Every structure is written in structure tokens, then in C-alpha cells.
Amino acid sequence: MKFELDTTDGKARRGRLIFDRGVIETPAFMPVGTYGTVKGMTPDEVKATGAQVCLGNTFHLMLRPGTEIIKQHGGLHKFMNWDFPILTDSGGFQVFSLGAMRKITEEGVLFSSPVNGEKIMMTPESSMQVQRDLGSDIVMIFDECTPYPATEKEAKDSMELSLRWAKRSKEGHGDNPSALFGIIQGGMYPELRAQSQAGLEEIGFDGYALGGLSVGEPKNEMINILDHCAYKMPADKPRYLMGVGKPEDLVESVRRGIDMFDCVMPTRNARNGHLFITTGVVKIRNAVHKTDTGPLDPECDCHTCGNYSRAYLHHLDKCNEILGARLNTIHNLRYYQRVMEGLRNAISAGKLDEFVQDFYARRGQDVPELADITN
């Protein structure tokens, strides 16, 4: 992987990640394909929304169908017929989401498979091996996702364990030519985040991610961590904010220097009739849309908006038709990509402030202030 930084506008950055399989223009949003599929979408449909990369979930793919069958296909790209880059998460977040079904030790995490109850030990080494078997282009280290809320001691202990696992992940990654990203932890404590980042930089990674956000904390706490941490992340490496989020969160994070995002929100919300448009949100199952012959978003160039009315989408939702979820997903993913395209173009033109003002004005919202934190 090669990372090129073209230009900046304030703290916002415009660049690209270059792989043998393709280029990812940044800032980038990555749709989530948990089980090797973006729910309800073919790979060509995902590409048509403007996506240049997608996510696979190490934890879920390890359990079903298992890495052996994926290896027999020649890796995840061929298994799912996706020839653009793939990022795989380490499985850490999913393991820690199991709660009482798992036990954390220095070695790793022992958990009961939610599929068949089998006891499985997941370690930094095994996570690296699974991701090597999947053949992903970007591999994430195995870390502990610090829960929220957490005391400073709990966050410190968790962060230090993640650092020890980061070193083992780097060693386990070995001669794998794929890019390896470190994950900054430390809960809602900027000092712990700084210690985590320093430790990760000492080990050395191809990119750096902020983990442990969007885990239930109030938005102001997430923004505070971004204010204190994003601009300090290595300038010559891609910066990835994991699991975030709403369109407004993407804009605010880009303003603070983040390059990469992933979130299930556009796809999950689409299946629940919650659709993102230029002026905010449309809840398509509400009765007001029953007789609306207009498009979902007149400014959107997606297949859904170009061919179907709000009334039709409302009808499909009410009848629980699979096509409704598919058309909604096409639109939401395209909307997210349009936001990212707008951000990229604005940064390139030195007009990010104008883009941000227009983005919020169309929603009837004020532009949030940027904190002046530079040390």
C-alpha cells in the first residue's frame, strides 16, 4: 500500500491509498460487508454507488463459512467476486461484544461460538492468520475495544493490553504483504489515547485507526477525543475512524483530519426505511409518503432516485418486499459516497468551509464550532 497526500484545507486532508487492486480516494467511506456481502447488494451494485473498498468481518467469516472454504476459492476477493480492495477488522470488537460469553486473558479471548457453542480462543496471532487466509488488502490489529463507560484505570489497563497485543499482531503479521493498521485505544481519556498512539508508532504500522468510539458515549465526548487526537496522528499515514457514523459525524471528522470511515448505518437504516437525503432524513414508512409521486431526493443521481417514487418505496416497505430494502440500500450508500465526493472536491478546491456551511444549511442546522486545540 502507498498513501499519497494531495492537499489540505485546514486540518482536512485529500489523498489516496494505492493498492495493486485499485485506488481508494480519501476521505473515503467503506460499506460494511460483514459476511462477505453488503446486505442485499451485488458487488457491481456496490461499485455503482461509488465505493472503492469494502469491509469484511474476520470474526463472522471465521465462524461461517470458515477460512478453509474461502482459501479454496483463492481468498475473500474471489469468494465474494469483489476485485477492489478489502479491509478486514480483527474480530476484536465482535468478540468483546459477546459480554458474559467471553473471558479475556493475556493470551487472548476465550469465547463460546454464537453459531454452535464451541469454545474458541482468539489471539493476536490467530486473528492475523485468519486475515492472511482471507487475503485482505488492509489488516487490522487484534485489540480490546474499551467499553463505555470505563474508569481511567479500566481504560488504562485495557489500552496497555491492546498495546501488548499490537506488538504480537505485528509479529504475527510477519511477511504478509498486506497493509497493517494499528488501533489507538484509551477510552475517553486524551492522555491515554496519546500514550496508546506513541506505543503504536514505536511498533510501526502502515496506518492508524481510532477505535473505541461510537460505543455508547455522548457525541460531545466523541468529538472531544477527535479534537485531541485526530490531528496528532501521523501525517504521512492514513487515519481511520472505526464504526462512525452519521453523515454529520463524517463531515465533522473530516474537518478534524480523518481519512477513512466505515459504518453499518447506511445499510442497516435503509432496511428500516430510514433514508438519508440532502435536506436530512426521510422515514419512508410514514404515511405522508403514500401518495408522493416525487423522487426520494431530487439531487441524487442513484438508480433508486432516477427510477422510483417515494410512494413506490413506501409501498414496498409496507409490503415487506425485498426490493424495497435493496432500493433503499442503493440510495443510502450512494448518498454517503456523494457526501464523500463533495468533501474531496471541496478540499481540493480549498472550499471546505463553503461545503460545510451548505451541508448544514440544507438541514436547517448551525455549523458546529471547531475547537482550537494544537498542543
From Swiss-Prot:
Its cofactor is Zn(2+). GO terms for cellular component: cytosol. Binds 1 zinc ion per subunit. SUPFAM superfamilies: tRNA-guanine transglycosylase (SSF51713). It comes from the Bacteria. Keywords: Glycosyltransferase, Metal-binding, Queuosine biosynthesis, Transferase, tRNA processing, Zinc. Pathway: tRNA modification; tRNA-queuosine biosynthesis. Pfam families: TGT. Its EC number is 2.4.2.29. PANTHER family: QUEUINE TRNA-RIBOSYLTRANSFERASE (PTHR46499:SF1). HAMAP family: Q_tRNA_Tgt. Belongs to the queuine tRNA-ribosyltransferase family. This is Queuine tRNA-ribosyltransferase. It comes from Pseudoalteromonas translucida (strain TAC 125).
